Structure formats: structure tokens, C-alpha cells
């Protein structure tokens, strides 16, 4: 299925039904009073979170969605039937904006959560409401009001605890395959990952976290080069970023892992200073390609070259070396953050 993370379309709620002008007419009651009923309300349009969806592709071609209008009122004080609401399923993590004004309408962050995006019109009043001591037979009623209509912009921002950052071919996809049930494509050429991938890491019973892998970032990404920049927004909700570098880039392709890491950080800051301020851990990958006696020094060498003062890990996503320790520390860090947040909101 094609991954689509931005769409625009128009929604229109149903109009309210008109009020009714009607008089009571029964045997032996030739001149009964007014009994016109109210119109039914128009159906509203809602977006509903669905954890089974991970793309907005269903809204790529359909550009208009409407709810049902309410029916007119009837005699004998019968209220018209209300219009049926329109429910549009969207992936959890969908940000909803008014395309015309730029207003943020809301954020769908939970499965089953509903967000009202267009309210149905109110039903009109029947002539029963206009009876008075001076007007016993009113012939007036009101029309139903129009339902809301607006153009929406939806942006999907995947919900993940941890984001993987790196240049193309540093082994992000291999790592996410090793630690989770996700199965992204793995191959020895750039941009194997074309779309964001999510993986659930089950560290122990009842302990898990979600990892997001996006296409690799290259120099000039903030100006649109490569594939990764348009997906960086999917890391905006993460609590922790893992900055992966290739520990054998120099030996295998004459690369410089320190320069690569500096390039990625510069692109990250150019795209979003706020994203660049998120906690980041340095992860030196592909150590299995080095002799065992060289691995620790290679990790330390890269960390020194970057002036890195945060956590540093040496791993092999292919063989699993160092991965258990990394996942355990991630789990503990995330749980500590959650406890801290719970304490602040208590």
C-alpha cells in the first residue's frame, strides 16, 4: 500500500431540517391550535482514530465528504429525523488543520478518539413555538441552519517513542528488523527505506516501546534533497532519537563517520531547531565488520571526533551485539521520563 502522509479535502455537515407550519385537525376540533414540529438537526462530520491504519491514502483521490441533512418537522409536534453523522477513519497521530485559515482544529492521538470537524446545522422551529396570547394561530416557522463546510489539511505524524536518525546505509533498517517484528527492506544501496517504518520492541513482558525508522538524511536535505526530510516530522512526537553512524564507513567506502554525523546534525537543525534539541544517543553500528580488538576504540574515536557528551553505544544490528543493553537502557529511560511526566501532572 502506498504511504501518504498529507492530504486535503472538503467536508460539509448536513443542514438542519425546516420547522413545520401545521394545525391540529381532529373530529370535533375544527379549529385546533398549532402543532408544527421542529426540523431535525443536520449530521456532523467527525474524524475517528483507527490504530489499524498507517496512511492517509484513502483520502488521496476522494476530495469531498458530506453528512446527511435533517428532515423537516411534521404535524402533531413531530420532530424531523436528524441527519446521520459522517465518520471518517484516520490513523492515530493525525494532525488536523483548516486549510483556509491555518487554524489547528485538533490532533487525533488515540484509537477510537473522535474529533468534530464540521458541525451539523440546527433544526428550524415549528409554528408551535410562536403561539402567544395575541397570536393563537401563528403561520410562521424557521428554516434549519446550514451545516458547516470547510477544507481540511491532514498531516500524519507517526506516534513513536524512539526515532532512528542516520545517513543512508548506516543499518537503521537492519537494526529495526533485529529488535522488533517490523520487516523493512534491507539492501546494500542508498534509500532502501522509502517510507517511515514502525516497529514495536517488546523488551520484557508488559514492557515495550515503539521505534520509527525514516529514510536516510543527506546533505542538502533541509532544502529538499533526498527522501528523508519530508519524513522528519514523524520524529516530532518521539521522546528520544538514536543517531546511527556506520562504524566501518572509512574502510568500506572511504567515508568519514564523524563528518556524516555532523552533516546530519546540521540538516536536523536547519529543518527544526526544536527537533534538534531532543535527547539524542550516539549509536555506532556495524561493529561486526571490525576485528574485536578494534571495536571499543573505534566507538571512542568517533565520539571524541564529535565531542559527544551524551550516551554512546557500539552495536551490530546484524549479529545483535550490544543490542540488548541498548534496548534495556532505552526502556529504562522512557519509563523514567513517563514517571517524571506523571509526577508533574499529578
Swiss-Prot record:
Main location: cytoplasm
UniProt subcellular location: Cytoplasm
Domain of life: Bacteria
GO cellular component, one term: cytoplasm
Region described as Disordered: 128-148
Keyword entries, A-Z: Cytoplasm, GTP-binding, Hydrolase, Magnesium, Metal-binding, Nucleotide-binding
Compositional bias segments (type: Polar residues): 130-144
Residues that bind Mg(2+): 173, 193
InterPro entries reported in the protein's UniProt record: G_OBG (IPR031167), GTP-bd (IPR006073), GTP-bd_Obg/CgtA (IPR014100), GTP1-OBG_CS (IPR006074), GTP1_OBG_dom (IPR006169), GTP1_OBG_dom_sf (IPR036726), OBG_GTPase (IPR045086), P-loop_NTPase (IPR027417)
Family statement: Belongs to the TRAFAC class OBG-HflX-like GTPase superfamily. OBG GTPase family.
Quaternary structure and partners: Monomer.
Purpose: An essential GTPase which binds GTP, GDP and possibly (p)ppGpp with moderate affinity, with high nucleotide exchange rates and a fairly low GTP hydrolysis rate. Plays a role in control of the cell cycle, stress response, ribosome biogenesis and in those bacteria that undergo differentiation, in morphogenesis control.
Protein known as: GTPase Obg
Gene label: obg
Amino acid at each position: 500500500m502506498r504511504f501518504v502522509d498529507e492530504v486535503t479535502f472538503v467536508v460539509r455537515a448536513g443542514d438542519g431540517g425546516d420547522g413545520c407550519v401545521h394545525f391540529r385537525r381532529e373530529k370535533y376540533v375544527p379549529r385546533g391550535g398549532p402543532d408544527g414540529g421542529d426540523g431535525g438537526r443536520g449530521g456532523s462530520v467527525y474524524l475517528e482514530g483507527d490504530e489499524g491504519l498507517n496512511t492517509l491514502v484513502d483520502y488521496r483521490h476522494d476530495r469531498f465528504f458530506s453528512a446527511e441533512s435533517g428532515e423537516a418537522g411534521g404535524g402533531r409536534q413531530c420532530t424531523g429525523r436528524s441527519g446521520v453523522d459522517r465518520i471518517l477513519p484516520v490513523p492515530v497521530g493525525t494532525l488536523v488543520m483548516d486549510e483556509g485559515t491555518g487554524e489547528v482544529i485538533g490532533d487525533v492521538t488515540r484509537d477510537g478518539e473522535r474529533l468534530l470537524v464540521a458541525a451539523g446545522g440546527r433544526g428550524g422551529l415549528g409554528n408551535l413555538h410562536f403561539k402567544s396570547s395575541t397570536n393563537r394561530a401563528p403561520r410562521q416557522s424557521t428554516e434549519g441552519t446550514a451545516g458547516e463546510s470547510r477544507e481540511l489539511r491532514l498531516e500524519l505524524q507517526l506516534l513513536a517513542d524512539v526515532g532512528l536518525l542516520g545517513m543512508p546505509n548506516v543499518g537503521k533498517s537492519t537494526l529495526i528488523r533485529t529488535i522488533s517484528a517490523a520487516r523493512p527492506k534491507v539492501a546494500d544501496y542508498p534509500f532502501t527505506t522509502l517510507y517511515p517504518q514502525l516497529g514495536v520492541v517488546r523488551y520484557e513482558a508488559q514492557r515495550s516501546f515503539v521505534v520509527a525508522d525514516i529514510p536516510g538524511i543527506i546533505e542538502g536535505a533541509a532544502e529538499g534533497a533526498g527522501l528523508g526530510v519530508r519524513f522528519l516530522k514523524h520524529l516530532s512526537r518521539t521522546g528520544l532519537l538514536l543517531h546511527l553512524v556506520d562504524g566501518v564507513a572509512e574502510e568500506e567506502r572511504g567515508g568519514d563517520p564523524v563528518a556524516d554525523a555532523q552533516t546530519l546534525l546540521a540538516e536536523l537543525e536547519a529543518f527544526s531547531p526544536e527537533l534538534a534539541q531532543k535527547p539524542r544517543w550516539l549509536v555506532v553500528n556495524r561493529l561486526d565488520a571490525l576485528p574485536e580488538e578494534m571495536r571499543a576504540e573505534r566507538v571512542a574515536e568517533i565520539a571524541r571526533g564529535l565531542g559527544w557528551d551524551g550516551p554512546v553505544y557500539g552495536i551490530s544490528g546484524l549479529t545483535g551485539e550490544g543490542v540488548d543493553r541498548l534496548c534495556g537502557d532505552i526502556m529504562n529511560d522512557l519509563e523514567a521520563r513517563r514517571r517524571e511526566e506523571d509526577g508533574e501532572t499529578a
